[in-house]
Amino acid sequence: MYENSVEIMSGDSFQIAVFETLFLLVSILAAALLLGGRVRWIWLVPIPVVAFLGKLILFFGAHGTLGNWIGGNYNWEGKIYSTAFTLTLIILLFGRDLKQVGLTLSQKGIAPRLGIAITSVTLIATIVWNALYFPGVKSEPIIDMLYQGSMPSLDEELWFRGLLLAMLVKGFTTNGVIRKDHYGIFLAAVVVTFQFWAAHSITTNGDWGFIFRTWYNPVAGIYGALWITIRLATGSLILPIILHTVANIVGYFV
């Protein structure tokens, strides 16, 4: 989603990272209970650790720990290192079958036509919503426009609807076989969607006070639900990445 350039204090950042990780942990445990505990913990246990490390990398970049060799008002360095971290894990865990994380140009998921139809509607709705809700063309330096047109969509799609979804599906399905009612995959999609919303809504009062700003960015939850539906329907991250990018940059044009 679109990112602002407001700097967050390092203490607040660490607290937010902890809160987001705990939120994810609780979501995973709740889903495991709904599945009667018939899950593969070997895939689920590492997820909160990976999520926490990825968030720390992101915040290190925001505070200049990773350098400031690109410039601009946004966290290029944190996003680049975070993306590299996610890609490394994808290669290590799913390198033999990248389709499991949606890294394929092929649009041959469980319902590709439905996915493409939802993509078309979502694209139009995104443009119309931005034109009505954020009237006037926004202007920023080219380096910032390039950031919004690349890093958030790549980093977040590779993590949320790529690696995280794939690990959850592995954990929520037994022996690598999808349940006949697809319940495990549905729960994985729900966890990813709520976590995506949480990542854009969780904050702190600065003294370990948990705050979930339910109506601060509800569109993140809506986008998250639509994009993961498209990801599952097409079997690919391509269209979610494109839609995510459009959502971030459409304000520069309409």
Q: Where do the language-model regions lie?
A:
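Residue-level recognition of transmembrane alpha-helices
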Residues: 115-116, 244
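Transmembrane helix-loop-helix hairpins at the membrane interface
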Residues: 5-9, 13-28, 124-254
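Intrinsically disordered, low-complexity regions enriched in Ser/Pro/Gly/Gln/His and often acidic
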Residues: 34-36, 122, 220
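N-terminal, membrane-interfacial amphipathic/helix-forming hydrophobic leader that caps
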Residues: 1-97, 249-254
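N-terminal capping/interface segment
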Residues: 84-108, 116-124
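Membrane-interface helix-boundary motifs at transmembrane edges
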Residues: 32-45, 98-109, 173-182
